């Protein structure tokens, strides 16, 4: 038991060596700032591209399953419904205008990753590199989003039944999000990040990080269903409380992403040293 514990400590210490001495919380907060600007434009572009591929009516029909199932405590169904409607009705000109704020997410990720990858601390044009390297992810966005939307009728129907059948629906939903996030994180870790870890390390840790993020996102849905008075700390303004809650969860989301990138770099460097 003692040897297993010591081995676990050594592995954990090695995984977080790239972020040792750096303020992980501050970098996660920085990504959250950029992400807060980019999250709506990214979602709009993904929905718009998907609607061009399969039609707006089908996108509305598939997303309606999620809208009907999401908890209403912080207004999530109304927000998702409005987001889908705006994305489906997006014009090419508005889509072009959304590209700039959407690309800011890549800048935030690249800047944070540069601070973790010590070999690139003097890199120039960090922001623009991150923006341009993130944009190719828009190409597979319709296929990735559609794979989740196609699973929604089945998973939401199972969740509504409750009990063990409902638990099966949650598991299937978890697996769908996990499979979609894995290639996204592989691209982010290997291409958007300044250091390019080897493919095996990227696949292993990218998939593991995606599994954690999938569970985390489902945890947010559970949180949104709790009867909490989010406006209490803000003078009764529920909208402000809901926004702060979303930003807090987005911040924790990026802590996991940074930790995953750090572990990927550590594994890749360890494998290179053994080669």
Region locations from a protein language model:
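Membrane-embedded alpha-helices and immediately adjacent juxtamembrane helical segments
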Residues: 1-275
């Amino acid at each position: 038991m003692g040897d297993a514990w010591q081995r676990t400590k050594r592995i954990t210490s090695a995984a977080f060596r790239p972020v040792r001495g750096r303020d992980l919380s501050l970098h996660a907060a920085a990504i959250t700032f950029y992400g807060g600007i980019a999250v709506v434009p990214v979602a709009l572009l993904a929905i718009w591209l998907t609607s061009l591929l399969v039609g707006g009516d089908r996108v509305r029909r598939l997303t309606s399953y999620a809208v009907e199932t999401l908890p209403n405590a912080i207004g999530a169904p109304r927000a998702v419904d409005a987001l889908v409607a705006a994305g489906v009705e997006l014009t090419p000109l508005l889509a072009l205008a959304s590209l700039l704020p959407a690309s800011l997410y890549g800048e935030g990720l690249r800047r944070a990753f540069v601070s973790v990858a010590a070999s690139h601390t003097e890199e120039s044009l960090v922001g623009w590199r991150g923006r341009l390297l993130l944009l190719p992810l828009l190409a597979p966005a319709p296929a990735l989003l559609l794979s989740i939307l196609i699973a929604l009728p089945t998973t939401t129907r199972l969740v509504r039944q409750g009990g063990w059948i409902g638990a099966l629906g949650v598991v299937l939903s978890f697996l769908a999000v996990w499979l979609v996030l894995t290639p996204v994180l592989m691209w982010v870790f290997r291409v958007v990040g300044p250091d390019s870890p080897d493919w095996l390390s990227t696949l292993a840790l990218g998939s593991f990080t995606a599994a954690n993020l999938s569970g985390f996102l489902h945890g947010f849905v559970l949180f949104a269903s709790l009867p909490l008075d989010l406006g209490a700390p803000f003078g009764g303004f529920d909208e402000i409380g809901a926004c702060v809650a979303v930003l807090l969860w987005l911040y924790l989301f990026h802590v996991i992403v940074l930790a995953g990138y750090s572990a990927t770099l550590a594994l890749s460097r360890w494998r290179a040293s053994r080669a």
